[in-house]
Amino acid sequence: MSQNSLRLVEDKSVDKSKALEAALSQIERSFGKGSIMKLGSNENVIEIETISTGSLGLDIALGVGGLPKGRIIEIYGPESSGKTTLALQTIAESQKKGGICAFVDAEHALDPVYARKLGVDLQNLLISQPDTGEQALEITDTLVRSGAVDVLVVDSVAALTPRAEIEGEMGDSLPGLQARLMSQALRKLTASISKSNTMVIFINQIRMKIGVMFGSPETTTGGNALKFYASVRLDIRRIGSVKEREEVIGNQTRVKVVKNKMAPPFKQVEFDIMYGEGVSKTGELVDLGVKAGIVEKSGAWFSYNSQRLGQGGENAKTFLRDNPDLAREIELALRENAGLIADRFLQNGGPDADDGDGADM
């Protein structure tokens, strides 16, 4: 008895390797080649493919240079905070690289004129305006499984009305119906999204929980499933107005990375969203450039590599808008120093009470 046990200990490594080989071959016979492999044997798995959000500061805050492909993203916030704008800017950036994009407009509120102003190629944008939540998610599932779509936006989770609710009476009480619909859909979608390398962005609204004494009373619609399945959750808020004399020409916006499976979360960034233009890219170049020491500020004058950009922020932005090559050069310099900028200059919001139940990892 003791000899057998000794022999097992001596041959333990050999037995384990043989047992592992037998298990791997059995799995491959049952489920096909490639159903299991060593992670390092496929270099493509390690690379994270991303698409820019249209905001340089947010790309840096995300830690990987943009939103990751093959993942579920949630963008939520109050009304008129810039949720759809951010999603459309991501579509525009993907289309610039030749990507195929789709927009599932459950709210039936997409403005094609505004989308074109943000740089979206309407001729090549797939759009669906479904009648029910089930139809919207079935269309999403079919497009994801095709493997041909790079970015798919669902606007919004709150508008994914279950068929039973539409067919029922106005005052009918149907608790948990939308949450169950989302939970089932995400269980089906998550594997297909990863295999097809499609980025699926769910836009969500916030609601108030009644009777909350401590912490934030805010919560997102559609139950808890999306919070768990999302790799990145962005909380977007309007914090002020951009004015030209007395006229309001844009919004000051703050985005907090509430959840991030790709890099450290809780980074916070602020930028301007201009009406009819989207994210002010030149404004970000000037602001981040000064913080990182790439753009020099002397009094009211801004300069880069001894070349004057202009007196005052607005003149510097106009100069960069008129000189796209120089703007691109500053952007590349900022992206090269992304790690330093993220650590030193992007505010770390931390999991505070403002996140409510949204700060989960």
UniProtKB/Swiss-Prot annotation:
Native species: Rhizobium etli
GO biological process, alphabetically ordered: DNA recombination; DNA repair; SOS response
Record family assignment: Belongs to the RecA family.
Role description: Can catalyze the hydrolysis of ATP in the presence of single-stranded DNA, the ATP-dependent uptake of single-stranded DNA by duplex DNA, and the ATP-dependent hybridization of homologous single-stranded DNAs. It interacts with LexA causing its activation and leading to its autocatalytic cleavage.
UniProt subcellular location: Cytoplasm
Coiled coil spans: none
GO molecular function terms listed in the Swiss-Prot or TrEMBL record: ATP binding; ATP hydrolysis activity; ATP-dependent DNA damage sensor activity; damaged DNA binding; single-stranded DNA binding
Gene symbol of the encoding locus: recA
Superkingdom as given in the UniProt entry: Bacteria
Protein name in the entry: Protein RecA
